[in-house]
Curated annotation (Swiss-Prot):
Chain segments carrying region Disordered: 1-39
Ribonucleoprotein recorded as keyword: yes
Classification of source organism: Viruses, Riboviria, Orthornavirae, Kitrinoviricota, Alsuviricetes
Function recorded in the entry: Required for genome encapsidation. Forms ribonucleoprotein complexes along with TGB1 helicase and viral RNA.
Record-stated family: Belongs to the potexviruses coat protein family.
Protein name: Capsid protein
């Protein structure tokens, strides 16, 4: 078989390979880059949009003033040498520790929770529905503001509730037996105070007791417990605090009433051999000299 001829040895030159044509640009993926002026304009537009969004986040319709956030502030951690030792009764309490303490106000001069629970159970035992017991107690206390909360009180009438009525004698006897009528009235003094102001209804006998018009709301036994923190408080708080004029008028009448009721307390014995069948000598106080210099 004869050999094939070598193309390089022939006189004809070999044909050169044609270069591949560049790919065609299709769509935006292969778009030509924009000029430097167009890039700067787009960047400025993006900055403008971001600036508008930033300014929108700062819009508000209120401006705080006189700022003070004491409640809820982050607690400070004392240094080791200043930490209080709970085992040492002489270690000092910081203001933060005192602020976090929760100690309820108490008073031995008013009915406590145990006594009120006994009173509530006894009144319910009379047949008063449990949902009306609190209202019955409050009505009795308001009535006592006009008559008296004395242990010698002999009431007349009834206390009505939506489904019936109960004699005042029964309710007051229960209160006297369980806690003392005046102690129960002291517990509700702030509520009674608000009731009288809302209804514009001062104690009935304020004029007979010698009170002036501006001090007429102070003419009840438990006035001096209106601002007591251990008493039952109205939801909104006191409508107003007692005025100095009301306080002075109440204390003056209270002093005279105590002296009048304590005439016999000066006697060592109440037998007729000591008293002669008469009340004790009247206690006389000269209040006019109280302001003499």
């Amino acid at each position: 078989m004869p050999p094939k001829p070598d193309p390089s040895s022939s006189g004809e030159a070999p044909q050169a390979m044609q270069p591949a044509p560049p790919p065609r640009a299709e769509g935006h993926m292969y778009a030509q880059p924009e000029g430097p002026g167009q890039n700067e304009e787009a960047m400025l537009e993006q900055r403008l949009i971001r600036l508008i969004e930033l300014m929108a986040t700062k819009r508000h319709n209120s401006t705080l003033s006189n700022i003070s956030f004491e409640i809820g502030r982050p607690s400070l951690e004392p240094t080791p040498e200043m930490r209080r030792n709970p085992e040492n009764p002489y270690s000092r309490f910081s203001i933060d520790e005192l602020f976090k303490m929760e100690i309820r106000s108490v008073s031995n001069n008013m009915a406590n929770t145990e006594q009120m629970a006994q009173i509530t159970a006894d009144i319910a035992g009379l047949g008063v529905p449990t949902e009306h017991v609190a209202g019955v107690i409050l009505k009795v206390v308001i009535m006592c503001a006009s008559v008296s909360s004395s242990v010698y009180l002999d009431p007349a009438g009834t206390v009505e509730f939506p489904t019936g009525a109960v004699p005042l004698d029964s309710i007051i006897a229960i209160m006297k037996n369980r806690a003392g009528l005046r102690k129960v009235c002291r517990l509700y003094a702030p509520v009674v105070w608000n009731y009288m102001l809302v209804q514009n209804r001062p104690p009935s006998d304020w004029q007979a007791m010698g009170f002036q018009w501006n001090a007429r709301f102070a003419a009840f036994d438990t006035f001096d417990y209106v601002t007591n923190g251990a008493a039952i408080q109205p939801v909104e708080g006191l409508i107003r605090r007692p005025t100095p004029e009301e306080t002075i008028a109440h204390n003056a009448h209270k002093s005279m009433a105590i002296d009048k009721s304590n005439r016999n307390e000066r006697l060592a014995n109440t037998n007729v051999e000591y008293t002669g069948g008469m009340l004790g000598a009247e206690i006389v106080r000269n209040h006019r000299n109280a302001i003499n210099q």
